[in-house]
């Protein structure tokens, strides 16, 4: 059977409905927020209203494309998903953004080999995402699983760090 892996669990692919394939409801921090505070989206009540408006307009599934280390907040996204259980679906991602969002000297993309990065992404899909988005010093794996792998690249270029993630 073909499935869609949502934050709250797998559903038959036939239940996906109208889908917003790239959106952002919560961004609790990260490099983009450091560069431009207007990118901060950390208000769960506002995110619930936004998702509710999407559902009211005929949408069914929203894919939130905030990857590891870029302000992803698994706990808040799970709260939103629970608020709309049975009404709509949220899908979260594992993977990585463009290299400009990671330190080229000390980020795990720069210091960890490809096999370990691939294993980490597989765990996010099979076992659950880290509650803290690997901001350390511990990993606290949740029951909420990623449904897609994001592979962000620079414009007209794939950098060395991006190649590592790919």
Show which residues each predicted segment covers:
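N-terminal hydrophobic targeting/anchoring segments and the immediately downstream early-domain regions
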Residues: 1-107
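Active-site gating/metal-coordination segments in enzymes
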Residues: 79-82, 89-166
């Amino acid at each position: 059977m073909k499935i869609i892996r949502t934050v709250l669990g797998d559903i038959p692919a036939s239940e996906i409905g109208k889908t917003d394939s790239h959106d952002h409801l919560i961004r609790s921090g990260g490099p983009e927020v450091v560069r431009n505070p207007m990118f901060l989206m950390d208000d769960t009540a506002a995110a619930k209203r936004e998702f509710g408006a999407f559902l009211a307009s005929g949408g069914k599934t929203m894919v939130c494309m905030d990857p590891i280390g870029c302000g992803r907040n698994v706990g808040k996204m799970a709260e939103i998903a629970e608020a709309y259980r049975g009404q709509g679906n949220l899908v979260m991602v594992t993977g990585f953004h463009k290299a400009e969002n990671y330190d080229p000297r000390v980020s795990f993309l720069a210091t960890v080999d490809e096999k370990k990065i691939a294993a980490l992404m597989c765990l996010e899909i099979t076992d659950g995402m880290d509650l803290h988005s690997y901001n350390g010093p511990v990993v606290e794996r949740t029951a909420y699983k990623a449904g897609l792998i994001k592979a962000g690249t620079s414009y007209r270029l794939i950098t060395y760090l991006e190649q590592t993630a790919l």
